[in-house]
Structures are given as structure tokens and as C-alpha cells.
Amino acid sequence: MRKKITLACKDCGSRNYTTMKSDASAAERLEVKKYCKTCNSHKTHLETK
């Protein structure tokens, strides 16, 4: 089953994106480079709980 997760900017902590993640296949937290409108540049976004 897939669950909805939120991605937060590593620098400012702003929660900018939501996405779906498979429970079974990925044990570690997701880490993606995406655009942060608060920082005004591309930053690393981490999965939040």
C-alpha cells in the first residue's frame, strides 16, 4: 500500500510538496532536490513524519 508523505526543505523547514511512497520497498527517508519558493532556489527536501 502507498502512503502520502510531505517533503520539507532541509534549510528553511518549509513544507512545500506532497507525494506518495510505497511502504514495503523504501525503509529509509526520501531525499529529493526540488525548488523551494521560500529560499528561492533548488534545495534538498526531506521526507517528514
Swiss-Prot record:
One example of a Gene Ontology biological process annotation: translation
Domain of life: Bacteria
GO terms for MF: structural constituent of ribosome
Annotated TM spans: none
Keyword Methyltransferase: no
Keyword terms, alphabetized: Ribonucleoprotein, Ribosomal protein
GO-annotated cellular components: cytoplasm; ribonucleoprotein complex; ribosome
HAMAP family (alphabetical): Ribosomal_bL33 (MF_00294)
Similarity-based family: Belongs to the bacterial ribosomal protein bL33 family.
Identification of the protein by name: Large ribosomal subunit protein bL33A
